[in-house]
């Protein structure tokens, strides 16, 4: 189905595109570039749970957000809008789009919501506008928006290095997770300024992660000392397994072999926690949506 067909008077409908959340199964800082950006090593795990981005095409070149994806975020600052405009400028297309999002991923939790929404817009509009740009180009555009955007564009679980943009696809075993959002947001630049943060970890290899020896997150000790609410979540989760931090926080998770085990464990958590049971994905559901529209 081409873009003109989707924009016809007989088919003015919105199309829905998944924007999955992610976990960082470990994260360490191994150095710093000359420009001040920190060098990381991490593993991105994509989930079967996340936001849904809705797209409706326009012929007048306008990019508009319908509703607010996040309270207090102006349209021009919204990563979805910025992604659409960046793609539009790069491709030189006269087509436009309306964008809205059903949010499930909590903001500021390290689950990648804003980055995933932006990546989904890039992938969806590349298809709907009929641009045919390669995924490498979309990933490069995404990197200008945020270091986590490329992994969502590519849609595969990955070992990541650099500032998070050097990606090596990896296979991960099926797993389920109990996620908890403590509801605390500490800006990442503030955490990078902490004197307690370890910035010179010894570089690891994928084999080290595969052996199970890499589980720590460099931001965890900083956040647990800084934020009592995060420490309280770790204490609660420690009763059902080994809690970990995702991204630069504040989201926490515990891994289980099966969804049933995760659901059973979550039943033992305090009822006031904002928690979910989700499963890891072998690849992004966004890739499945892309395949469906290209049939």
Curated annotation (Swiss-Prot):
One GO BP on record is:
isopentenyl diphosphate biosynthetic process, methylerythritol 4-phosphate pathway
So where does ATP get bound?
A: 106-116
Q: Which GO terms describe its molecular function?
A: 4-(cytidine 5'-diphospho)-2-C-methyl-D-erythritol kinase activity; ATP binding
**The protein's Enzyme Commission number:** 2.7.1.148
> What is the top EC class of this enzyme, as a single word?
transferase
Q: Which reaction does it catalyse?
A: 4-CDP-2-C-methyl-D-erythritol + ATP = 4-CDP-2-C-methyl-D-erythritol 2-phosphate + ADP + H(+)
Please tell me whether the keyword Nucleotide-binding is annotated for this protein: yes
Q: What pathway does the UniProt record associate with this protein?
A: Isoprenoid biosynthesis; isopentenyl diphosphate biosynthesis via DXP pathway; isopentenyl diphosphate from 1-deoxy-D-xylulose 5-phosphate: step 3/6
InterPro entries in alphabetical order: GHMP_kinase_C_dom, GHMP_kinase_C_sf, GHMP_kinase_N_dom, IspE, Ribosomal_Su5_D2-typ_SF, Ribsml_uS5_D2-typ_fold_subgr
Protein's UniProt keywords contain Ribosomal protein: no
Q: Where is the active site?
A: 22, 148
What HAMAP family does this protein's entry cite? Answer: IspE
- Role, per record: Catalyzes the phosphorylation of the position 2 hydroxy group of 4-diphosphocytidyl-2C-methyl-D-erythritol.
Task: Please identify the protein, giving its name as recorded.
Answer: 4-diphosphocytidyl-2-C-methyl-D-erythritol kinase
Source organism: Xanthomonas campestris pv. campestris (strain ATCC 33913 / DSM 3586 / NCPPB 528 / LMG 568 / P 25)
């Amino acid at each position: 189905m081409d873009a003109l067909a989707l924009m016809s008077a007989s088919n003015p409908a919105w199309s829905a595109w998944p924007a999955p959340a992610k976990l960082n199964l470990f994260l360490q800082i191994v150095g710093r570039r000359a420009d001040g950006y920190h060098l990381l090593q991490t593993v991105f795990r994509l989930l079967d749970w996340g936001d849904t981005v809705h797209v409706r095409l326009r012929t007048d070149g306008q990019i508009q957000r319908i509703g607010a994806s996040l309270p207090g975020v102006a349209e021009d600052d919204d990563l979805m809008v910025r992604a659409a405009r960046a793609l539009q400028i790069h491709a030189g297309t006269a087509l436009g789009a309306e964008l809205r999002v059903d949010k499930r991923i909590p903001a500021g939790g390290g689950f990648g919501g804003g980055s995933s929404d932006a990546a989904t817009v890039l992938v969806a509009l590349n298809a709907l506008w009929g641009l045919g740009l390669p995924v490498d180009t979309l990933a490069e555009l995404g990197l200008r928006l945020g270091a986590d955007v490329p992994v969502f564009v590519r849609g595969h679980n990955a070992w990541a290095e650099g500032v998070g943009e050097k990606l090596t696809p990896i296979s991960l075993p099926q797993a389920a997770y109990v996620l908890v959002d403590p509801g605390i947001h500490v800006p990442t630049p503030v955490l990078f300024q902490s004197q307690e943060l370890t910035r010179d970890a010894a570089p690891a290899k994928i084999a080290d992660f595969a052996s199970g020896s890499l589980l720590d997150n460099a931001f965890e000790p900083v956040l647990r000392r800084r934020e009592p609410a995060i420490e309280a979540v770790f204490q609660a989760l420690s009763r059902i397994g080994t809690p970990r931090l995702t991204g630069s926080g504040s989201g926490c998770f515990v891994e289980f072999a099966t969804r049933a085990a995760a659901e059973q464990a979550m039943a033992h958590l305090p009822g006031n926690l904002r928690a979910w049971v989700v499963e890891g994905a072998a690849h992004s559901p966004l890739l499945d949506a892309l395949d469906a529209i290209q049939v």
